[in-house]
Amino acid sequence: QRQMCIRDSARTAREFLAVSDAPSLLRELEPAQITSLEVSLAAAKGDELAKSVYDFTGEMLGAACADFATFCSPEAFVFFGGLTKAGDLIMKPIEDSYNRHVMNIFRGKPKFLVSTLDGSSAAVLGASAVGWEL
């Protein structure tokens, strides 16, 4: 299941639409026309199926962060890329899931941040900063 979180939200939305008959603004579009932006706009308008895409992805990412915290105890998790443009639609489910899955001693400790760097630079600069400290 965790492999789905690496897919884009448009693909996840198409999969949810295929296995559900729940009403959704996304049904007005052909499957090939559904983009991550369309999912985000539908979720912002209160579309429950679109919001469930972010809830699902946030659940998977939060659980993965909880697993990571068990052996690394990070001060923060920094997210970047297009998905983070959804703001609280994705960040709140990530943090909520983390707090449900993590061991008590790590609950509520790390910060969940969105990088202010553009996606192509964020990973390289982050790795460079770690190397600089060594």
What label would you give each PLM region?
Residues 3, 7-134:
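ATP-binding/phosphotransfer module of carbohydrate and carboxylate kinases, centering on a glycine-rich
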